[in-house]
From Swiss-Prot:
It comes from Saccharomyces cerevisiae (strain ATCC 204508 / S288c). It comes from the Eukaryota. Residues 1-17 form a transit peptide. Keywords: Mitochondrion, Ribonucleoprotein, Ribosomal protein, Transit peptide. This is Small ribosomal subunit protein bS21m. Present with 1270 molecules/cell in log phase SD medium. One of its GO terms (biological process) is mitochondrial translational initiation. It is found in: Mitochondrion. One of its GO terms (molecular function) is structural constituent of ribosome. Component of the mitochondrial small ribosomal subunit (mt-SSU). Mature yeast 74S mitochondrial ribosomes consist of a small (37S) and a large (54S) subunit. The 37S small subunit contains a 15S ribosomal RNA (15S mt-rRNA) and 34 different proteins. The 54S large subunit contains a 21S rRNA (21S mt-rRNA) and 46 different proteins.
Amino acid sequence: MLKSTLRLSRISLRRGFTTIDCLRQQNSDIDKIILNPIKLAQGSNSDRGQTSKSKTDNADILSMEIPVDMMQSAGRINKRELLSEAEIARSSVENAQMRFNSGKSIIVNKNNPAESFKRLNRIMFENNIPGDKRSQRFYMKPGKVAELKRSQRHRKEFMMGFKRLIEIVKDAKRKGY
């Protein structure tokens, strides 16, 4: 039984190594293209039997386009290097608008700081940031935390029942009882 388990692990290891070798081979091809596209193109010209190098050949080699995706996947180029400053600013604003609101910062639109402060204040209270700040200010022992949670849960249930009773009384009063 131990022998068969050992064989299975060897087979799975061999499969793992073959996939790693394939990935290494693909990455090495990408590295060759990115690191020295001119030499790669010259090597392909020599394979065809063309040994003469003219200005047009060099211009063709220099104008070779390497796909940006290939360069990004190899980690050789950053997308921000290809964008202009205006495009970077526009994309950062769009990304900021799509991010989740943590309640710490906002974007000031239309040069209106008063509106922005109101929005920041609303977001902070929606996320209960002042309450979290108060509750996290001092250390509380685990027993005290459990007691506080139990008290808050009881208060919440009591208030729900009390509000329901008030609604019943209002309804009865409206009906004339």
